């Protein structure tokens, strides 16, 4: 995955970065309850989770700051971040699945279905590719 270094001395948020990088865990996660009534109505038989994952991935990638990571003490911005997400196998064990690269909706769904089948053969949580260049996504519909 390609990325470029961000000049934090010239970045408007450089001071905030300098402050937060001193913290033990200077990273953020986002959890939100979202009304997806209209989204569900528009699915028309298409796979729910992969369709939602496609929409969330595209939306997150539109925000450059969400593609930024700390690599060897430097801030880098990935050109595109791929979704890595959890799947529960029939035996109750969780594994990761990854859909790499920017894709059209149809290709994303097809690759997601292929990766889910491949992921079912895994025995543990292992990460593929460059984990820094991923968005880590979990869907927990039973919490609300």
Regions found by a protein language model. Name each.
Residues 65-72, 121-127:
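A short, aromatic/hydrophobic, helix- or strand-capping loop or linear motif
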Residues 1-47:
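N-terminal beta-alpha "docking/capping" segments at the starts of catalytic domains
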Residues 41-64:
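Acyl activation and transfer enzymes in specialized metabolism, enriched
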Residues 29-31, 80-84, 132-134:
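Broad gene-expression machinery/nucleic-acid interaction feature
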Residues 22, 75-77, 126-129:
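A general structural signal for short secondary-structure junctions and capping/turn motifs
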Residues 66-98:
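Small-residue-rich loop/turn and linker elements
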Residues 89-143:
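Helical lid/core segments from catalytic subdomains that handle acyl or acyl-like groups
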Residues 40, 60-61, 69, 78:
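Short active-site-adjacent helix-start/loop capping segments
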């Amino acid at each position: 995955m390609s990325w470029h270094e961000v000049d934090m001395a010239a970045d408007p948020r450089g001071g905030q970065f300098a402050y937060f990088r001193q913290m033990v865990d200077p990273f953020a996660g986002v959890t939100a309850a979202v009304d997806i009534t209209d989204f569900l109505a528009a699915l028309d038989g298409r796979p729910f989770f992969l369709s939602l994952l496609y929409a969330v991935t595209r939306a997150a990638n539109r925000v450059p700051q969400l593609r930024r990571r700390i690599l060897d003490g430097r801030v880098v911005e990935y050109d595109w971040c791929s979704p890595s997400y959890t799947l529960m196998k029939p035996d109750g064990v969780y594994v990761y699945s990854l859909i790499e690269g920017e894709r059209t909706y149809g290709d994303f769904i097809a690759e997601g279905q292929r990766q889910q089948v491949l992921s079912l053969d895994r025995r543990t949580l292992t990460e593929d590719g460059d984990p820094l260049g991923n968005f880590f996504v979990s869907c927990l519909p039973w919490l609300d």
